[in-house]
């Protein structure tokens, strides 16, 4: 049976590994379970079982420089976790950003230029403001990441604000669609008299990246809020 003092020792050890708190909680549960099993099966003391468990996790948790430009040491376990989180948010964004992008293309094919301009802006701004509203409606939860800035509460917190990066291209698109919606309607539908490949790519990518950034942030927000509920009971130990 693991005592409170021993649990504290395990927590402090894992905190020294600078794991995100949501990941630390999961690893902590594995440590406790593994230590208990080793004690029971091999008739070892807590200290002996703890050392044996630490050794079994050493390769996974040991940080080292992987040739990154930021010179940050990172463990294999964290690389794996980072990759999983990136893929989760990426696939969510790819999946859901396709729908409004196709809708904009449909509008460009079936509506007048002025209507196309206003409807496209409505979709883009609507999605962006929805992301902002969701953020501020859960502001107290998102604020925890700043309050406990010495720690990473969850890796999802790094992607919550990606939608802010899109404001520059958003204003660019706004100006272009207001000033000359007909030109960009023709570009999007490949009806321009002298289509310029670079311009076509720029317009498509600008619109798609704005929408993609919004859904990437929405995925990060959703996962952050899910993980922060697991983290809250642990905050008293920080």
Predicted segment positions?
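Serine/threonine-rich low-complexity intrinsically disordered regions
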Residues: 3, 45, 70-71, 112, ...
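N-terminal, intrinsically disordered, low-complexity segments
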Residues: 1-64
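Exposed alpha-helical structural elements
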Residues: 5, 9, 48-49, 73, ...
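Generic surface-pattern signal
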Residues: 15, 19, 36, 40, ...
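Cytosolic juxtamembrane regions of integral membrane proteins
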Residues: 44-107
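Acidic-enriched, low-complexity/disordered segments with a strong bias for Aspartate over Glutamate
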Residues: 22, 29, 37, 58, ...
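Hydrophobic alpha-helical bundles in membrane proteins
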Residues: 85-238
């Amino acid at each position: 049976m693991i005592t409170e003092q021993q649990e504290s020792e395990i927590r402090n050890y894992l905190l020294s590994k600078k794991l995100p708190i949501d990941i630390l909680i999961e690893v902590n549960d594995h440590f406790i379970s593994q230590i208990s099993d080793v004690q029971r099966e091999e008739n070892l003391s807590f200290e002996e079982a703890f050392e044996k468990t630490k050794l079994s996790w050493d390769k996974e948790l040991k940080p080292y420089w992987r040739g990154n430009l930021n010179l940050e040491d990172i463990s294999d376990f964290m690389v794996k976790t980072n990759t999983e989180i990136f893929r989760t948010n990426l696939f969510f964004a790819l999946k859901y950003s396709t729908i409004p992008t196709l809708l904009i293309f449909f509008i460009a094919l079936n509506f007048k230029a002025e209507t196309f301009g206003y409807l496209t802006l409505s979709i883009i701004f609507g999605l962006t403001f929805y992301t902002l509203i969701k953020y501020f409606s859960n502001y107290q939860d998102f604020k925890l990441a700043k309050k406990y800035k010495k720690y990473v509460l969850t890796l999802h917190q790094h992607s919550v604000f990606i939608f802010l990066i899109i404001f520059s291209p958003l204003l660019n698109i706004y100006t272009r669609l207001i000033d000359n919606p007909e030109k960009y309607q023709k570009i999007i539908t490949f009806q321009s008299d002298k289509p310029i490949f670079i311009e076509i790519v720029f317009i498509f990518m600008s619109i798609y990246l704005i929408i993609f950034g919004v859904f990437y942030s929405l995925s990060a927000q959703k996962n952050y809020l899910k993980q922060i509920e697991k983290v809250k009971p642990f905050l008293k130990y920080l």
